[in-house]
């Protein structure tokens, strides 16, 4: 069958090929610029910056942080059979002393408060009895995480300005702990808990992810391309094009101010995979011989024939990722725009640089070098009648699995809950890493979910006695719930001070006692800088209440926050002094809840926009809405069926897997576009069987090879240390394989059904 072409496009591509040396030179210069830009991209994998800065909660949290600045909080768990034994306390005292000498580190434990109450005393058997009584005479130490059944806690505050400074500080802390961490001392284990260690691990692994997986994918790619085309020259043209495209695409981040995040590894990988698929389509068509008079004309005609489907398919993928710009999750938004921009660069390179390299390297045609897949024509001959015979089972099975996948994602009322959502920082850390295990150990007993309640009052009234009394009632109400571990605020300072001086941590409830307590708090704030952390000392216009608990015990996402807000409203209604105050939930914990609640809207909104734009764009190209819907079956089948796999495999929606809809739709639509484009070519014969045979012969082989490349590329992520990236690799690879199966079963079956329906309508009309 002759290749249909546009004479003007043939003339254009002829000039492109003739300018091959100039084109290669220009892209070489852009390659150097891209490499420079890629090296300038900053790292920003922190979870607390996932929400865009313009978000109201993010703005409020930023204002709160400016008013109540504090360093990074961390905790050392010194585990021992008896944490209050003489040896344990002596070792803890030594550790606290050495940590206090490290720059930017403030350390305190229950011994800090004991020395404040009793002065500096040598720890001996008699003194240990008094320390034990002091430590166990209140619940304050256990609530603060400074004492557990089998551990002694040392709280740390790191006042560091940069990640590099933080890493140096953590290294200094580790050098202090190393001699005691081998089990030779009184402690059976020393656990490190807190965001400094988690953030350091994430930054290290995020930065290494791209460098680790891109070479691995490159090995897969080179092996597959060589096996498919069996030509070093074809391999060279494809590899050089990919290297230039990826370098320029990554370098765009420096131009637009984007940064490396926990999911930015997907940008070069997605650009490389999509570009590779397009290059496979282009080279497969180039290798097919025709009746052209010379190689230059043949090359230009092949490019012209594939220009429309390749442009449409790359547009589909770019739109899919560009639709992520609607997300309120900043890394997702940036990743979508970054990938879409990279795909535009890739499209230009596919129709300029790649043809230039094909010409310069004189890549062989199929008559000169046999490619893999000699068995494929026989498969096509068997598939065409099989898809006609089993058209209804193929399409019906696909629709049934799609319904099951939708149920797995959105849930079934009364029977099945929706697919779970996760943004807890621990879900981004390898569970086998020591830092994750240490943090989970503390989380199970003390909880790590923190909500900051910013209570705003009339300026100058933050220390009014009645207001403080109302805040203490609110604190007691929260602490009466066993799911709440600790509540710290201005009145907790009074409780600590009262316990140190009198041995009782209970504050009086009588109104006439609070004027003196308010005066005492003012005096404490004058002498103790730590006490100022809970009051706006500049304007006395607000106070801060920090609430820590286990959010998982409250149920669905955001339930702990709603409980705190409802408790505040109840106490506020009962306390006249609180009625003029306004409370706002802020902080990293609240931002985490916001992110979680926006994951599903990000998935549905971006997917809906992607699907709508793709449908409208290709309706303009192919002019057949019913056929266009039919050709989307494999993509929709792959996306929804993969949610069923996620449900069965226990994989939750997170910052990476939430992208599966747009990623798979944009990537797999490439196959359906090429298939349907060549199906229309074959329809000129008037036979559905011949049209399907032509589409499978021309597009089927590159669809198969492109899917193998796509799935192997994303499967490389399965070796990642970052759980979300590993899960995304497994899920996306599964989706590509599912789409491939549907391409050769459900899609032809749907086209058979559509063609028979059209013939029936024409028969009735005649």
Language model feature labels by segment:
Residues 59, 95-158, 200-204, 485-551, ...:
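Extracytoplasmic
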Residues 50, 83-90, 161-171, 213, ...:
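Solvent-exposed, non-transmembrane alpha-helical starts
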Residues 74-79, 140-181, 188-191, 451-458, ...:
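A short beta-strand structural signal in non-transmembrane regions
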Residues 56, 73, 386, 390-517:
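Juxtamembrane segments of multi-pass membrane proteins
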Residues 73, 103-119, 142, 184-194, ...:
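Short beta-strand elements
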Residues 1-45, 49, 62-63, 161-424, ...:
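Membrane-embedded transmembrane helical bundles of large multi-pass transporters/channels
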Residues 44-104, 108, 460-468:
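Juxtamembrane extramembrane loops of integral membrane proteins
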């Amino acid at each position: 069958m002759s290749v249909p072409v546009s004479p003007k496009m043939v003339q254009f591509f002829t000039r492109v090929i003739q300018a091959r040396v100039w084109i290669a030179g220009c892209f070489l210069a852009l390659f150097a610029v891209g490499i420079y830009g890629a090296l300038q991209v900053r790292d920003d994998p922190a979870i607390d910056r996932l929400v865009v800065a313009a978000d109201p909660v993010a703005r409020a949290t930023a204002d709160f942080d400016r008013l109540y600045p504090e360093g990074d909080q961390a905790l050392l768990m010194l585990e021992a059979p008896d944490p209050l034994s003489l040896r344990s306390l002596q070792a803890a005292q030594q550790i606290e002393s050495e940590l206090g000498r490290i720059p930017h580190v403030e350390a305190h434990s229950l011994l800090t408060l004991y020395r404040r109450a009793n002065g500096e005393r040598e720890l001996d058997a008699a003194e240990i009895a008094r320390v034990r009584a002091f430590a166990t005479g209140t619940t304050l130490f256990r609530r603060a995480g400074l004492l557990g059944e089998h551990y002694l806690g040392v709280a740390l505050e790191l006042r560091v300005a940069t990640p590099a400074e933080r890493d140096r500080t953590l290294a200094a802390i580790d050098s202090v702990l190393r001699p005691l961490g081998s089990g030779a001392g009184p402690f059976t284990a020393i656990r490190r808990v807190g965001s400094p260690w988690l953030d350091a691990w994430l930054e290290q692994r995020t930065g290494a992810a791209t460098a680790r997986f891109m070479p691995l994918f490159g090995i897969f790619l080179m092996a597959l391309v060589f096996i498919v085309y069996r030509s070093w020259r074809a391999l060279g043209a494809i590899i050089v094009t990919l290297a230039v495209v990826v370098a320029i695409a990554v370098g765009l981040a420096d131009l637009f101010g984007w940064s490396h995040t926990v999911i930015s590894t997907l940008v070069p990988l997605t650009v490389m995979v999509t570009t590779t698929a397009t290059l496979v389509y282009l080279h497969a068509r180039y290798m097919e011989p025709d009746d052209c008079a010379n190689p230059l004309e043949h090359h230009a005609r092949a490019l012209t024939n594939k220009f429309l489907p390749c442009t449409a398919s790359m547009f589909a993928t770019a739109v899919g990722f560009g639709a992520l710009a609607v997300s309120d999750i900043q890394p997702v938004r940036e990743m979508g725009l970054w990938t879409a921009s990279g795909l535009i660069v890739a499209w230009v390179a596919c129709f300029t640089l790649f043809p230039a390299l094909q010409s310069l390297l004189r890549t062989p045609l199929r008559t000169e070098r046999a490619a893999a897949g000699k068995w494929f024509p026989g498969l096509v001959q068997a598939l065409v009648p099989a898809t006609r015979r089993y058209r209804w089972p193929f399409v019906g099975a696909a629709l049934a699995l799609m319904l099951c996948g939708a149920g797995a994602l959105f849930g079934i009322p009364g029977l099945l809950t929706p697919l779970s959502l996760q943004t807890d920082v621990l879900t981004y850390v390898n569970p086998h890493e020591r830092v994750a295990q240490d943090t989970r150990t503390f989380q199970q007993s003390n909880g790590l979910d923190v909500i900051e309640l910013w209570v705003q009052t009339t300026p100058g009234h933050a220390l009014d006695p009645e207001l403080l009394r109302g805040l203490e009632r609110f604190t007691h109400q929260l602490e009466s719930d066993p799911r709440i571990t600790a509540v710290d605020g201005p009145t907790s300072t009074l409780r600590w001070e009262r316990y140190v001086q009198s041995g009782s941590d209970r504050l009086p409830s009588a109104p006439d006692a609070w004027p003196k307590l308010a005066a005492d708090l003012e005096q404490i704030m004058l002498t103790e800088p730590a006490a100022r952390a809970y009051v706006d000392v500049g304007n006395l216009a607000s106070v801060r209440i920090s609430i820590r608990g286990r959010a998982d015990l409250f149920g669905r996402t955001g339930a702990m926050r709603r409980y705190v807000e409802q408790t505040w409203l109840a106490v506020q209604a009962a306390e006249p002094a609180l009625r003029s105050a306004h409370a706002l939930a802020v902080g990293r914990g609240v931002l985490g809840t916001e992110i979680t609640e926006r994951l599903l809207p990000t998935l549905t909104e971006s997917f809906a926009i992607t699907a709508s734009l793709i449908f409208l764009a290709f309706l303009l190209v192919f002019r057949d809405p019913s056929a266009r819907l039919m050709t989307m079956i494999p993509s929709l089948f792959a996306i929804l069926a993969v949610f069923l796999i996620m449900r069965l495999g226990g994989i939750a929606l997170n910052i990476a897997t939430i992208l599966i809809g747009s990623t798979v739709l944009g990537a797999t639509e490439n196959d359906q576009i090429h298939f349907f484009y060549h199906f229309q070519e074959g329809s000129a014969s008037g036979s559905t069987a011949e049209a399907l045979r032509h589409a499978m012969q021309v597009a089927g082989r590159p669809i198969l090879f492109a899917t193998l490349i796509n799935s192997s590329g994303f499967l490389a992520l399965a070796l990642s240390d970052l759980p979300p990236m590993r899960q995304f690799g497994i899920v996306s690879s599964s989706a590509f394989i599912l789409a491939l199966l549907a391409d050769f079963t459900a899609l032809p079956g749907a086209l058979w059904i559509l063609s028979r329906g059209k013939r029936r309508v024409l028969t009735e009309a005649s």
